[in-house]
Amino acid sequence: MTASSSEAPKAHLGVTPPINTDMPAEHDAAASEALVHTLRELGVYESDAGKAVRTGVLDRLRAIADAWCENEWALAIAERACDGADCERALAASAPPRCELRTFGSVRLDVHTPDADIDVVLVAPRHCTRRAFFDTLVAALEGDAHIGAGGVMAVRDAYTPVVKLRVGATDVDLLFAPLACDELPEPLDVMDDAVLEGLDEAAIRSLNGARVAEMLLSLVPDPAVFRVALRAVKRWARCKGLYSNVLGLLGGVNCAILAAFVCQRYPNAAPSTVVGRFFRIFDGWDWPNPVLIAAPGAPPSSAGDESVASRYAAWNPRLNPRDRAHLAPIVTPAHPTMNSSYNVGAPQLRAIKDELSKGLETTRRVEKLAAHWRADESPTGDRAADLRDAWRRLFAPSDFFARHRHYVQVDVSAADDAGLRKWNAWCESRLRNLVVALDTPGYVRARPH
């Protein structure tokens, strides 16, 4: 046995081994610099002032949540105590349990645009109930001078219950996950499956946003490369009319998982290479084969299997006929695993594949230009300008309104702003079904935008 053959294989992130582990060449660095320059030119990065505003919003919400959690704890103590003296002694005997605000989505991944909203989940001990969250915490939010009653909309009956609010000029989606414990662990590891113990499905779904974000960052070889590539993928999807999870197209989580998958396959690649390989891989992807960045949880092997993850339904097309019907599975890494693109229909998938094919042509042009880069070339020279122009083509607006002859437009109206927000959200959630219903083979090829 040779020395090289006796070496243990290097561990890799993800389910499948890397395609290429080569380090970036000089022309890759030049193409990546041109990509970042183009993204900055398009305004996808937030300014320091914008970041300060966002931090202030989170600090304000954290202060309100801390006060609410402490007040709920005092009420719980009062309910258990027999009289006022007992209550005062109980309150003095221990410090109030803490709660935590955890950002997720684009803000946690640090790929948000200046106008992005903040996705955040409030994680609290068991004395903070969902009923109190929608009653007393919502009242506290409405009473805050920076928010006000008109800036808060509670959606209790949503698939994932949420409070939508506006703090100043910043929109926030606030979820709630009460854990089955008297005090939060210190530190709180949301990636530990044990945190799911005793939670109902609404709490699991609320917490999974934070779990997925943390796992995404832990499953990519280089988070900095991942962030640039993801910014590029999201901008491309927006420009081509593909960025809308509610329409059954690509949402933020979908894009993040796809970008992470490519990073795993090319662990040492530069951002420009990852973006190019993104189009190469997914233009030729054999759907409905799933995109996985972590091994899916195994189903219970027996009735005695008591692992936390096994007690919650995870995406599994072998066991679940509904999962088997999904057209383009992009599976979340955190247990219980879910198909983040469950709502993709035939017309949506056709639109995505069409734009992937066009994106592949554009990124191949970038690669050809970069291949002729010389080490002594100036980053402000003609070839660098050509690279930036090539990237701009990738982010050019869609020709959707010049390509088609017939369009369906849905107008939504209501008596007031609050009613319009609710009615518009309901109508939006049904539009993907309208697109699928309109799509008639041989007669109508519906194209959502």
What are these regions (language model features)?
Residues 115-121:
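Acidic Asp/Glu-based divalent-cation binding sites
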Residues 9-36, 231, 241, 248-251, ...:
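Pol beta-like nucleotidyltransferase catalytic core
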Residues 102, 121, 164-166, 173-175, ...:
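Residues in well-ordered beta-strands of folded domains
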Residues 43-46, 62-76, 111, 126-128, ...:
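Eukaryotic basic, amphipathic alpha-helical target segments in cytosolic regions
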Residues 144, 150-152, 157-244, 321, ...:
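Conserved NTP/Mg2+-binding pocket subregion across the NTase superfamily
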Residues 49, 125, 221, 246-250:
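Conserved aromatic-histidine-acidic binding/catalytic patches
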